């Protein structure tokens, strides 16, 4: 999605059904919210969490979109908005004794990143 008003360009990328809980994803995205693209890359590269790989992949995608579609320089971008919401839950069952089964809900999350050009 592209919003272009008064030469304020914001570029958005969305990742859906990512197999990690939104709680774990928010632990990572809170560290990079409002930072520049280059600072966010540095932070994500050295954080020891699984969620960093998903955020890094989507962040590089939104930067590539900005570069390809608008010719914007990646070093001029900063993260305006980043949100991790809950996605659909995968429903599984754990077999238990005497024919019972306990439900297991495996969470997924939807990640949205919006970047803007530094003014």
Curated annotation (Swiss-Prot):
Q: Which GO terms describe its biological process?
A: translation
GO MF term (any one): structural constituent of ribosome
User: What keywords sit in the KW lines?
Assistant: Chloroplast, Plastid, Ribonucleoprotein, Ribosomal protein, RNA-binding, rRNA-binding
Which superkingdom? Eukaryota
Instruction: Give a Gene Ontology cellular component term annotated to this protein.
Output: large ribosomal subunit
Q: One Pfam family name from the record?
A: Ribosomal_L22
* Localisation per UniProt entry: Plastid, Chloroplast
Q: Does Plastid show up as a keyword for this record?
A: yes
Q: What does this protein do?
A: This protein binds specifically to 23S rRNA.
Family, according to the entry, reads as follows: Belongs to the universal ribosomal protein uL22 family.
Q: How does it assemble?
A: Part of the 50S ribosomal subunit.
* PANTHER family assigned to the protein according to its UniProt record, in alphabetical order: CHLOROPLAST 50S RIBOSOMAL PROTEIN L22-RELATED, LARGE RIBOSOMAL SUBUNIT PROTEIN UL22M
Protein name from the UniProt record: Large ribosomal subunit protein uL22c
């Amino acid at each position: 999605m592209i919003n272009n008003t008064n030469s304020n360009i914001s570029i958005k990328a969305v990742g859906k059904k990512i197999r990690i809980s939104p709680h774990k994803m928010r632990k990572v995205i809170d560290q990079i919210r409002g930072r520049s693209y280059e600072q966010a890359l540095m932070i994500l590269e050295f954080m020891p969490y699984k969620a960093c790989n998903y955020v890094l992949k989507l962040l590089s995608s939104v930067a590539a979109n900005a570069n390809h579609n608008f010719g914007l320089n990646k070093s001029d971008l900063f993260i305006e908005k980043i949100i991790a919401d809950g996605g659909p839950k995968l429903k599984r069952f754990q077999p238990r004794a005497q024919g019972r089964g306990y439900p297991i809900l495996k969470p997924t999350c939807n990640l949205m990143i919006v970047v803007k050009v530094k003014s």
